[in-house]
UniProtKB/Swiss-Prot annotation:
GO terms for biological process: fructose 1,6-bisphosphate metabolic process; fructose 6-phosphate metabolic process; fructose metabolic process; gluconeogenesis; sucrose biosynthetic process. Mg(2+) 2 binds at residues 116, 119, 282. It comes from Burkholderia thailandensis (strain ATCC 700388 / DSM 13276 / CCUG 48851 / CIP 106301 / E264). GO terms for cellular component: cytosol. This is Fructose-1,6-bisphosphatase class 1. Its EC number is 3.1.3.11. It is an enzyme of class 3 (hydrolase). Homotetramer. It catalyses: beta-D-fructose 1,6-bisphosphate + H2O = beta-D-fructose 6-phosphate + phosphate. One of its GO terms (molecular function) is magnesium ion binding. The keyword Magnesium applies. It is found in: Cytoplasm. Keywords: Carbohydrate metabolism, Cytoplasm, Hydrolase, Magnesium, Metal-binding.
């Protein structure tokens, strides 16, 4: 009787460490701790109303957004799991105004962890897929982190990933050597490699955008979406479908698996605040993953990974996904400026 050998996340990381020689042991251990925290978050999400974790917490985060109970719980799970391991100098989160230095009573490491503990949390109460997004940077100041230590462009990321808590719980990871997907086997509690070297098709007929904001869009985005909506009779000569989950991890995961373009552009409502998504813990890690899978990511005017951050909670426009479509939108932005 043959036994199918399965590759767990731990085995995969150890093999990468041996084969590529560019995955330090501390980084491998850090990724495993983050993945373990995501398992705990998945467990709490799956309990739903049975865990008394639905609804709002009666507080707001630094962006002025109402915090859900699971937002706060997920943030605490990630902090508690990572503060004592000796791999980190500091952490930063969507749910905290300032960064979190590793307490003096724990050993400190050379890495910085930035995360959105529960992306798409507006969907919690209606049981739509949500997730966790994270990014890992090296601390340029050794083990004494400051806020400035975090303000590195996305090209400096050494690892990035996300978990999706949906019909299956999956963990998607890149360390700069392609993108792989692991599925949580709840019977044994292990992450098992289920998709290797994911690639985003260069062309697509699907797009994701919140069309209710159409009246606020700037001309390049309006031009692009109008062309898609014109269908086979329009300038593109083919029909396109719109998909919008209002959960970035879910929308990006779909694009990673079957192609598409995701857009959360700047609009005219807030000209002084370019975009809604946060650069450090949403746009950068997702852009790293998308580029590693053969896609592209831009603000419309600049490659997202080249943006120099000015603050932990900086916002940027985000257009990412299938390469040819992203490049078309970028070209429309450039033409509008010329």
């Amino acid at each position: 009787m043959s036994i199918t050998r399965r590759t767990t996340l731990s085995k995969y990381l150890i093999e990468q460490q041996r084969e590529t020689h560019n995955l330090p042991a501390d980084l491998r251990l850090l990724i495993e701790v983050v993945a373990r925290a995501c398992k705990a978050i998945s467990y709490n999400v799956s309990k739903g109303a049975l865990g008394d974790a639905l609804g709002t917490a009666g507080s707001e985060n630094v962006q002025g957004e109402v915090q859900k109970k699971l937002d706060i719980l997920s943030n605490e799970i990630l902090l508690d799991a990572n503060e004592w391991g000796g791999n980190l100098a500091a952490m930063a989160s969507e749910e905290m105004e300032t960064f979190f230095p590793i307490p003096a009573n724990y050993p400190r490491g050379e890495y910085l962890l930035v995360f959105d503990p529960l992306d798409g949390s507006s969907n919690i109460d209606v049981n739509v897929s949500i997730g966790t997004i994270f990014s890992v940077l090296r601390c340029p100041d050794g083990q004494q982190a400051t806020e400035q230590s975090f303000l590195q462009p996305g090209t400096e990321q050494v690892a990035a990933g996300y978990a999706v808590y949906g019909p299956q719980t999956v963990f998607v990871l890149t360390t700069g050597n392609g993108v792989n997907c692991f599925t949580l086997d709840r019977e044994v509690g292990s992450w098992v490699l289920t998709q290797s070297n994911l690639r985003i098709p260069e062309d697509t007929r699907e797009y994701a955008i919140n069309a209710s904001n159409a009246r606020h869009w700037y001309d390049p985005v309006k031009r692009y979406v109008d062309e898609l909506n014109a269908g086979a009779e329009g300038p593109r000569g083919e029909n396109f479908n719109m998909r919008w989950i209002a959960s970035m991890v879910a929308d990006v995961h779909r694009i990673l698996n079957r192609g598409g373009i995701f857009m959360y552009p700047a609009d005219k409502r807030t000209p002084d605040r370019p975009g809604k998504l946060r650069l450090m813990y949403e746009a950068n890690p997702m852009s790293f993953i998308v580029e590693q899978a053969g896609g592209a990511a831009t603000t419309g005017l600049k490659r997202i990974l080249d943006v120099q951050p000015t603050g932990l909670h900086q916002r940027v426009p985000v257009i990412l996904g299938s390469k040819n479509e992203v490049e078309r939108v970028a070209r429309y932005h450039q033409e509008a400026q010329s």
